[in-house]
Regions:
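Active-site core of metal-dependent hydrolases
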Residues: 97-100, 120-125, 178
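Active-site-proximal loop/helix segments of hydrolase catalytic cores
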Residues: 78-81, 92, 97-116, 184
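A metal-dependent hydrolase metal-coordination microenvironment
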Residues: 1-91, 116, 123-152, 163-169, ...
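C-terminal functional module detector
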Residues: 6, 89, 93, 152-154, ...
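General structural signal for secondary-structure boundaries
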Residues: 26, 65-67, 76-82, 107, ...
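Conserved beta-strand termini and adjacent loop/short-helix elements that scaffold enzyme active sites
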Residues: 51-53, 99, 159
Length: 213
């Protein structure tokens, strides 16, 4: 990897940060792991970018292009509706991607799709489709996500979705290295760059078509 995003589960997701804390303290605690990762990344030459994963009763969204300062000054994001979330994040120049949109698991009461309320969709999720994955492993989730993104003309992303030190190798290969979370948001939303997606096992073009080895 040239770089990674730290996208931990936020306030209504699976987080270890005490939800009873005042907003400012909660944000500092939530962002602390990112700074730890970034400090180590700086030592070894790995770019580390901030993001987070919001949760609406099992429906999850990956948020990019915002930072700790933005969270501190926008406490309304915590209880924002999905519609309000898109507006707030876009005003910052950020990006809202529907995470693993067609995954079916016990923690997801029902699959809810809202193509008009996102900037794109995660078409490739290594936790769903890599042979190394130890959870949620069903490649059909990715196949359906790709079909969904194509149907609604949504740009696609890819990621590992790891919750441990397991190295799945999922992600996106860009022609030029990213310089910030905002840069990532602009490249995905702009759809001008011919990037490729991977789950660590297979490669796909940005439209979700398999690239032969």
């Amino acid at each position: 990897y040239a770089g990674i995003f730290v996208t931990n589960h936020a306030w209504y997701g699976n987080t270890s940060v005490d939800r009873s804390l005042p907003w400012e303290e909660w944000v500092h605690g939530f962002c602390a792991p990112f700074y730890t990762a970034k400090a180590y990344g700086d030592q070894i030459g790995l770019s580390v970018f901030f993001g987070y994963e919001s949760c609406y009763q099992g429906t999850e969204f990956l948020i990019y292009g915002v930072d700790e300062e933005w969270l501190l000054t926008h406490p309304e994001i915590k209880d924002a509706t999905i519609t309000e979330q898109l507006q707030l994040v876009r005003e910052q120049g950020g990006l809202v991607m529907h995470a693993h949109p067609l995954r079916e698991q016990a923690y997801i009461p029902r699959v809810r799709l809202c193509p008009e309320l996102v900037d794109g969709a995660e078409g490739i999720n290594a936790t769903d489709s890599s042979h190394l994955s130890t959870s949620h492993n069903d490649p059909r989730f990715d196949e359906r996500a790709i079909a969904y993104a194509r149907e609604h003309d949504l740009p696609m992303s890819a990621g590992s979705d790891v919750h441990s030190t397991l190295m799945l190798g999922g992600g996106i290969a860009f022609q030029m290295p990213l310089v910030s979370g905002r840069d990532y948001a602009e490249r995905i939303r702009g759809r001008k760059e011919d990037y490729v997606l991977t789950n660590g096992d297979q490669w796909f073009d940005r439209f979700g078509n398999r690239i032969d080895d």
